[in-house]
């Protein structure tokens, strides 16, 4: 997105936003010094990569089922981002005003003519070359310039509920992507079709399927059918957080009377779902307490593993009950395993006694996220006779973002609350 934005701004130096001058200005770019042609190719390919990554990210979230509960805001804003980026690419191809732009203009007019906003059908403006409206062309140019502002706004909405959200990839990955884009642009420069002629139907037109796939529909369906298809597609995509969610985990609850206001849960919550509230009557030096925002909480339980005072709980898996459960080991069961319910715990059947055929000799506790596991729970199991404790979390795509990393840091003594090595044998 950044590459497309920067190159697009630079291309304004050479581009003429008028129906009569657009094609000639783009043709001049293609025939001008090497740098300008490279900028145009970078603009085109970076746009393709941008929408491709958005689509892949959407499928990743869909496959990982990261769309239910409080995540619905991220899902809907993500769908809007996808639509905005596609629209920016659609209008961008229009601004070239070649044969591909001709088909885009006719398809758009076919789609918009259903609306009762226009005094006369838009298609009439594209019957002849003389009927082309320069003002309408400039409006398309203005929309193309305005959409990136909407992308930035919805991107903020998309990630505003994430704690320590990352806007950019690593420097190494960013440079690698830029290098690939530059090499691709040099080897396969962006093409330019023949100039748009409203009286001639282009033959064997090569299109960019990532942005121009709707042309297949606009050339075959009426505007009314297109609107109906768009409506049901939008409802289907936007309804995924409610239609495909099996059930949302119970949110965390804070016992405000015992909260000591340490703020560790606020620092650890992956989804910014905890706020510190001022006490009306401070007690023993404590001036604030934690409160879970139920509209943001996804029920990951990472805050439970952060709370030294055991003031945060989930009704489905109370901390004290689990500590008692792992303390009462049988003679043939001398190990304890905390398994993420979103990964291994979902695949292995575990009975109410904590027995699992895949882990003989272990008392298995499925948890919403391994970040739920407080170090005191591990210490208690080891002090009460457990010969070892296994903590198995998610793989490369954690269901609850940083929960597994936090647990690893706590076990290593790099993050509070850490495992007290003087109380147990960490080996």
Predicted regions and their residues:
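Membrane-embedded alpha-helical bundles of multi-pass integral membrane proteins
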Residues: 1-13, 24-43, 56-251, 266
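Conserved oxyanion/phosphate-binding beta-strand-loop segments in alpha/beta enzyme cores
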Residues: 2-22, 338-353
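Individual alpha-helical transmembrane segments in multi-pass integral membrane proteins
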Residues: 44-49
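Iron-sulfur-associated redox domains of electron-transfer enzymes in respiratory
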Residues: 79, 93, 104-107, 318-427
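Short Cys/His-rich Zn2+-coordinating modules
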Residues: 240-253, 278-280, 284-290
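Membrane-interfacial segments at transmembrane helix termini in multi-pass membrane proteins
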Residues: 247-257, 313-325
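Membrane-cytosol interface motif
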Residues: 251-270
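Iron-sulfur cluster-binding cysteine motifs and their immediate structural context
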Residues: 264-323
């Amino acid at each position: 997105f950044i590459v497309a934005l920067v190159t697009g701004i630079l291309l304004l130096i050479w581009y003429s936003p008028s129906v009569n001058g657009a094609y000639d200005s783009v043709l001049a770019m293609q025939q001008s010094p090497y740098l300008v042609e490279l900028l145009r190719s970078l603009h085109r390919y970076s746009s393709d990569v941008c929408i491709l990554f958005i689509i892949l990210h959407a499928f990743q979230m869909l496959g990982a089922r990261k769309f239910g509960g409080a995540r619905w805001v991220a899902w809907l804003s993500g769908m809007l981002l996808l639509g905005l980026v596609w629209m920016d690419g659609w209008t961008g191809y229009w601004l070239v005003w070649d044969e591909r732009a001709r088909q885009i203009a006719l398809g758009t007019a076919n789609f918009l003519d259903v609306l009762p906003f226009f005094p006369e059908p838009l298609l009439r403006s594209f019957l002849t070359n003389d009927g082309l409206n320069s003002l309408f062309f400039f409006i398309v140019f203005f929309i193309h310039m305005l959409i990136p502002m909407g992308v930035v706004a919805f991107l903020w909405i998309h990630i505003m509920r994430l704690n320590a959200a990352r806007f950019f990839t690593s420097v190494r990955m960013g440079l690698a992507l830029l290098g690939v884009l530059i090499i691709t642009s040099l080897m396969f420069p962006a093409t330019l079709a023949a100039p748009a002629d409203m009286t001639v139907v282009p033959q064997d037109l090569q299109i960019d399927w990532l942005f121009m796939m709707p042309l297949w529909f606009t050339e075959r369906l009426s505007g009314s059918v297109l609107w109906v298809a768009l409506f049901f597609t939008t409802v289907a995509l936007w309804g995924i957080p409610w239609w495909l969610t099996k059930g949302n985990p119970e949110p965390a609850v804070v016992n405000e009377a015992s909260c000591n206001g340490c703020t560790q849960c606020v620092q650890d919550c992956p989804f910014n779902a905890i706020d510190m509230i001022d006490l009306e009557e401070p007690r023993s030096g404590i001036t604030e307490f934690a409160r879970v925002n139920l509209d943001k909480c996804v029920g990951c339980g990472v805050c439970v593993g952060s709370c030294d005072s055991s003031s945060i709980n989930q009704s489905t898996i109370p901390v004290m009950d689990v500590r008692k459960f792992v303390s009462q080991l049988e003679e043939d069961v001398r190990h304890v395993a905390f398994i993420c319910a979103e990964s291994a715990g979902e695949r292995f059947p575990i009975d109410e006694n904590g027995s699992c055929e895949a882990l003989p000799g272990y008392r298995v506790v499925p948890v919403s996220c391994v970040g739920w596991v407080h170090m005191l729970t591990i210490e208690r199991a080891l002090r009460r006779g457990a010969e070892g404790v296994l903590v198995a979390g998610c793989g490369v795509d954690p269901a609850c973002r940083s929960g597994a990393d936090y647990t690893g840091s706590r076990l290593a003594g790099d993050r509070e609350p850490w495992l007290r090595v003087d109380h147990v044998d960490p080996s």
